[in-house]
Amino acid sequence: SYVSQNCKNLTVLQKLLSEITWEQILLTSDVISYFVADCALQLFGQKPLFFQYLQGKISIGKYDILLDALIGDRQRAMDFCQKYPAFFAHEYIWEPGEDILGLIYLSCKNMGSRKAHGSYYTPTKVVKKLISHLDIEHMGKVLDPCCGTGNFLLQLPESVDLADIYGTDTDAVSIRIARLNMALKYPDADVEEICEHITEKNFLTEYDRTGFDTIIGNPPWGYAFSNEDKAVLKARYATASGRNTESYDVFIERALEILVPDGTLAFVLPEAVLNVKAHMRIRTILLQGSSVKSLTFLGDMFDGVQCPCILLQLVATGKPLSTVGMRIEDRTRTFIIAMERTVVPENFSFRMTDEEYRVLEKIKNSIPVCYLADHADFALGIVTGNNKKFLSAEKTEHSEMVLKGTDICKYHINPVKQYLRFEPEQF
């Protein structure tokens, strides 16, 4: 869940979403902003009085400017409120550390749109776990370069001053919500300071602040860059020089550029960054000038996304990567690497203890070893496009048996239940 399971506002939001579905409301950006603004008004201490706010009868003082930026045209908002007053009768309460504003926004946004932009919102438990691994007393100046509605920044401990918190994103509505979240987290904050620190900018091409001690976040995964964007990035970043540009690789490269010496980078990333060939450029960069302080394997953590993810915490040492002191955690164990290991950009394999590593090294170095490379053929499994049409439970003279991945076990295969006439031109 994006928020904690005991978030009291969840029930309220579920009622709102049910009403929206019942009324078949077209969820435009403006309409979503009205729902978020209504909630924000109540979190600042007002009851469900959104229409009265739009009429100018009530105020939240210096933060009116932040709420107005989210609402936009007041008359259009009033027209919508008058047409659907029940939507604005729900009561929300302020719960520290819960990004209910962000949850309303992401719940209303179209899932297809989020996928196109590579923005899958990070569950709060993942955010808290990432932050728990940081050195809180020495965080210094903190940046989330893809801050969305500000959930990572909300989870920072109270000891981190607003003066040291920065965030940027290309989603204008998300930035307006993040500013409101910062105003709620720091009730005495200056509006100008919030707006200067939380900005709507492209981190890769427009954001020019540097000298950060800590950079945190969940960069976009698989963002669909335009051809124009690719050309700009290719001229600037080594990780964008290949045929396909992976957004999170470029985010890592840029983040390392603007960290202070020995600064910390902590990102939520797909596990593929450690071993897939397409990401070898970023692994080469990491090998040349950083060390891995902590690596946590989380498995599948995002709703509707089958992609194992990791928490990767780096230190920008400016020196070749050292494995000594690296903390490794997965769902079954946690251990520290105490020895220097040979690491190559082709594959970052840190998921073994020192004892296991020594055994494998001994095997490789003491006896003749044969590898699968150059001794095996690799192929993609059959994709028929229509299993009901092409698969059959009956074996014929011309059919072949079909094995699924789950049918292949150690030392045996499961009984064959399906058959296929292999005519690939029909698939």
Question: Across the structure, where does each feature detected by a protein language model lie?
Answer:
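Short, flexible beta-strand-to-coil junctions
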Residues: 41-46, 404-410
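Class I S-adenosyl-L-methionine
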Residues: 2-184, 202, 275-282
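Short, conserved active-site loop motifs that form the nucleotide-linked donor/cofactor pocket
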Residues: 196
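Sequence-specific dsDNA recognition surfaces
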Residues: 235-237, 382, 409-427
